[in-house]
Amino acid sequence: MATIKDVSKETGLSIGTVSRVFNNRGYISQETREKVEAAVKKLNYQPNALARSLSKSSSRIIGLIVPHIAHPFFSDLLASIENATRERGYALMVFVSKGEEKSEAEMINRCRENRVCGLILCSGRFSTQKIENLEFPVVCIERNPDGAAFAIECNNRQGGRLAAEELIGKGCRNLVSLAGIQGRKMPADERSIGFEEVCREKKVNFICLSYPPELYDRLDYTALIDRILTERPETDGIFASSDIIASQVLQVAF
């Protein structure tokens, strides 16, 4: 792998001059800049984002903390963010927390150590006060504990309402909502609330169930679904909070 010394040797310029080009510091002639750019391309030199950050207050590194990447939502999210950061000349530092608060706190410290210029956070465990005390900007995705942090969120409650209205409109009268994790605050909780609101308004039988954390971690709900259908044979409509759950409902039911 090429180094800054190789670029210096290729161009005949000092390492200091090459470094100034990389960091866009001081006066650099167009000829010098083009010479360095040509050498970088020829040598396929990849500047180390962290090394470049050592002389600055921050880097061109963005941190991303997700609970896991086995779930399609997070794997798709990761792919999209990675593409966006790469296209804009940023590096992405990914952490998988498994939803553990201690792990997430350690990952925040790693972000500090690596001088990230920003963090994308998928966690419901950090209060706005904790987020505001960080020295870099934070964007929360689908998890905004007290509703005050900068966040990108779906209207999950409306999604739950639409699901209930669709099932009831199809003639279903004994509904089950399978959404949310026991003991954890999740976006799916709002879907269950919206689902319940419509069921009460329409006066249909329903039950809202959450599932143990270990099922979410394993992404295997088949035993739970089988038990629900066995214990509630009258069930004629199920609201699944994710595509994974929906596919496993179809697998068990048919």
Model-derived features: positions:
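N-terminal helix-turn-helix DNA-binding module of bacterial transcription factors
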Residues: 1-60, 73
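Alpha-helical recognition/docking segments in bacterial nutrient-uptake
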Residues: 2, 60-165, 169, 227-230, ...
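Acidic/polar helix N-cap motif
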Residues: 6, 24, 100, 155-156, ...
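Short beta-strand segments enriched in small/hydrophobic residues
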Residues: 17-20, 54-68, 174-182
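Generic recognition of short, well-ordered alpha-helical segments
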Residues: 31, 49, 75-77, 106, ...
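Bacterial carbohydrate/catabolite-sensing allosteric modules
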Residues: 42, 83-88, 106, 136-140, ...
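Short gly/ser/thr-rich secondary-structure transition/capping motifs
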Residues: 42-48, 101-102, 120-123, 250
